[in-house]
Amino acid sequence: MSEKVTIKVERKELHLPTIALRGLVVFPNNLVHFEVGREKSIAAVEWAMANNSNVFLVAQKEMETSEPTQQDLYTYGVVAEVKQVLRVSDELVKVLVEGKYRAKLTELDTTGDFLLSAVRSAPVRAAKPEEAVETEALLRALKTGFDEYLGMNPRLAKDVVFTIVSSDDPMFLTEYMPANLLFRYEDKQAVMNENTLNGRLQRLVEMLRRECQVMKIEKEIAEKVNESMDKNQRDYYLHEQLHI
């Protein structure tokens, strides 16, 4: 089952130990820590480490599912290298992984000690020459949207901000931004599911706009609550003063 014995052909299937992720989406070229508690997931990590194999990481559709089948998992995930494993207890392991490349789940075997996936490399299609103008426009819209997002999230990590602001590589940004910004995991998976660069850019632009709209409404609600509290406190103070 080791990945290394598989002939490296672009559309060749690999059979990899698999971890079904709850509320987490891992993208290529990103380092991620997470905890593993299910027996089959721990077994997958241990087998990968013992056999110098990569793993396939794919998100569950429902976090409550304890024993996922193929229908319970999304189709697209990431082939990743296990960089570090720390056993916290008999029932919990902390794992550090690095996403390598996007892959498509074609078959899932749930009968063994761990989940075993048949996967194929699924690179995102770059923009065609005739789509270059659209790509540039989407990239500009993405940068504008991020500027607005940043204005409402001033505590965002400086290294994340610098990386995004200084990069003009759209393919890189469509992996780095969803991996490092506070989007819902369902939204991150929606980006993972997109098969084209421009499709991903469009999805990210929409996500940033939605997040900014939500944050504006949240701010307005908070301001109204504070005004109401201030008024109640003033009324209470005046009421008490009248009784002195």
Task: Go through each PLM region and give its residues.
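N-terminal low-complexity, acidic/polar interaction/targeting segments
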Residues: 1-244
